[in-house]
Amino acid sequence: MQVDNGNISVGEFHSNKEFVALGESATAEEHDVFSDPLYFSFDVRDLFAVPDFSRTAEMLNTVWQRSEYACDIDGVIAIDPLFIQEMVRINGDITLDNGQVLTGDNTAEFMLNGIYKAFDPDTQDMYFEYVASAVMDGAFSNMTMDKMMQIAQAMGTLAEGRHFYAYTFHEDEAEYFQGAGFAKNAPDSETDPEVGIYMNEQNASKLGWYLRRSSTITRTACNADGSQTYHVTFSITNTLTSDEMASATTYILGGAQPGVDGIVAPAGTSAQRMLFYAPAGGSITNLTASGDVRDQENKTMDGKNLITNVAYIAPGETVTFDFDVTTSAKAESDLRLDQTPAGWLDENVTYDTSACSLK
């Protein structure tokens, strides 16, 4: 994408297959966290496993500079299917060559699930490119004040939910990108506390669409030093039905697949590498789980401490985590949840702060 005096143009799209062989630049800590049950090679396909987008942008730039397209770049923009769906809602429907119409309600489902049912992997890339290109071209052409306001409002909401990132490598511009909340990292603010919960699929599959989450964050104490304590409940349910199991391909279900060494989990069972981050200057205690959760450890990655484990969620099953969070004494706002983006805007998080009020 190029911007010249307010004129925005979108260049050619390239499949990540072009960049897989260009290697990685991950640290020993990053490899340690993502070493099993599925080993992440940290080629271009794995870079969003790291919840600090500043680090992801750095690694993406490294890969780009190794490619045949190498050039100086000003920053990195990343979008997901929900961002594309919201742009379709603003710009208008897209009709595919098979007659299917993508709207502001069904585009994310198509890109996260339907496309894998309707087309083989080689054809999928063609449709991804077509949809993304049409959306990005449409988003920044024929701009009106109303359209600009709709896009600006959507970008703020989408960035908060990690569906949109915009990161600049220029320090003098950082306040307008990183400083405006467009490039989220794992919790790093003591005054505006967040607890981070991030998920990475270990069963090579497309099961993410079938995972539904719910969370409750309940304030339990306002402490004398100015910190607050909360109880967090976080659940993941695998909604895959027996009918869907019978009709879906191994590309969606995972399990034993051509070109994938070993079986991390049976077909249809999601295996999630979970990462739990305390608020900056705070702590997580008393972490327990119901369901099939294994291999819990304390780790450090990119300068931040975390707790990690692996949750195995069979079709129809639920895994639930419970733990307590204490914020920094410098906290000036209520605790919020930062999590891996899903395919919908409603994050299904309930906040209860009735126990006490911030001082």
Predicted feature locations:
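Non-catalytic, solvent-exposed segments at the cell envelope interface
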Residues: 1-348, 356-358
